[in-house]
């Protein structure tokens, strides 16, 4: 049985994602913030943490990236991809909607809907979509933009549902564990994630990306976050196709390790969308294995 911490309270999209990772007997534990969910794993209070990492409309989730870059390292072992549309909840006693609360990422994804349908309402940021529902229930605000599942947990009425400015919006979530972990087996449709602190000099990022390009590795995400301690320095969060068990990926990670003053491995796991890696000619795993075997034979004096 595992305890899975998640960015709560109950009724968030992250809770929905966490449920996709559950096995029989597992327990969900709500955390007030993303850093607290991850720290629960670091302290041994939870076996894993489910956190949002990126949204197709608003991009990366800064709180997740920043929390994974520092502190005791955690490793991702699985990902989930959820379609994102919202419900607008209110109390029975509310007449005119004057205030609407939600998490900033949620508000950004329904901005146009709010302008068209509640043009006079003041928009207020909350810690999470479910926290907004709690605040509406307590009378602090008139309405909340929430995950559809929130209505099952809070005694509020649905003012609108299937709300989204972008119909095919999705959010990706990671399941993080504390090492040592058993890495998932490669599937052929995998993603590897790292964070690299590169030297502050001309061409550093180009050098990192070249290490991937020369090995035929396709980049799926690149984000930069400030180092916090050193002004003008950044950490690069890089996702790419493939699994660390593959020779070409392992070779690339070794090269990145040589070039960067710090590289943190954030996991290799099956892609939730099932998209297989695009492998260029001469970049297949067998190509790397054959080349390594040839060099070994040359070193032994057996091959010219």
From Swiss-Prot:
Residues 3-178 form the Prephenate dehydratase domain. It catalyses: prephenate + H(+) = 3-phenylpyruvate + CO2 + H2O. Residues 193-271 form the ACT domain. Gene3D superfamilies: 3.30.70.260, Periplasmic binding protein-like II (3.40.190.10). GO terms for cellular component: cytoplasm. The keyword Membrane does not apply. The record marks 171 as: Essential for activity. Keywords: Amino-acid biosynthesis, Aromatic amino acid biosynthesis, Lyase, Phenylalanine biosynthesis. GO terms for biological process: L-phenylalanine biosynthetic process. Pfam families: ACT (PF01842), PDT (PF00800). Pathway: Amino-acid biosynthesis; L-phenylalanine biosynthesis; phenylpyruvate from prephenate: step 1/1. It is an enzyme of class 4 (lyase). GO terms for molecular function: prephenate dehydratase activity. Its EC number is 4.2.1.51. Transmembrane segments: none annotated. PANTHER family: PREPHENATE DEHYDRATASE P PROTEIN, PREPHENATE DEHYDRATASE-RELATED. This is Prephenate dehydratase. The lineage of its organism: Bacteria, Bacillati, Actinomycetota, Actinomycetes, Pseudonocardiales. The gene is pheA.
């Amino acid at each position: 049985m595992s305890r899975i911490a998640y960015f709560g309270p109950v009724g968030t999209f992250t809770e929905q994602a966490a449920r996709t990772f559950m096995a029989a007997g597992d327990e969900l534990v709500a955390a007030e913030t993303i850093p607290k969910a991850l720290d629960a794993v670091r302290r041994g209070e939870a076996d894993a943490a489910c956190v949002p990492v990126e949204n197709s409309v608003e991009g990366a989730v800064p709180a997740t990236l920043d929390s994974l870059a520092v502190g005791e390292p955690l490793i991702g072992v699985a990902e989930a991809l959820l379609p994102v549309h919202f419900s607008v909840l209110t109390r029975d006693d509310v007449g005119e909607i004057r205030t609407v609360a939600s998490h900033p990422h949620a508000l950004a994804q329904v901005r146009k809907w709010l302008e068209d349908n509640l043009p006079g309402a003041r928009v207020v940021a909350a810690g999470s979509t479910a926290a907004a529902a709690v605040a509406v229930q307590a009378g602090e605000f008139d309405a909340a933009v929430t995950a559809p599942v929130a209505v099952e947990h809070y005694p509020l009425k649905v003012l609108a549902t299937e709300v989204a400015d972008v119909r095919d919006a999705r959010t990706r979530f990671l399941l993080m564990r504390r090492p040592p972990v058993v890495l998932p087996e490669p599937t052929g449709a995998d993603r590897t994630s790292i964070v690299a602190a590169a030297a502050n000099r001309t061409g550093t990022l180009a050098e990192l990306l070249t290490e991937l390009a020369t090995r035929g590795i396709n980049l799926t995400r690149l984000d930069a976050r400030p180092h916090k301690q050193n002004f003008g320095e950044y950490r690069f969060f890089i996702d790419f196709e493939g699994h660390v068990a593959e020779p070409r990926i392992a070779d690339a990670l070794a090269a990145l390790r040589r070039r960067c003053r710090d590289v943190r491995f954030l996991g290799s796991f099956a892609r939730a969308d099932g998209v297989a890696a695009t492998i260029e000619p001469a970049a297949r795993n067998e190509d790397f294995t054959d080349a390594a075997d040839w060099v070994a034979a040359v070193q032994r004096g057996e091959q010219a």
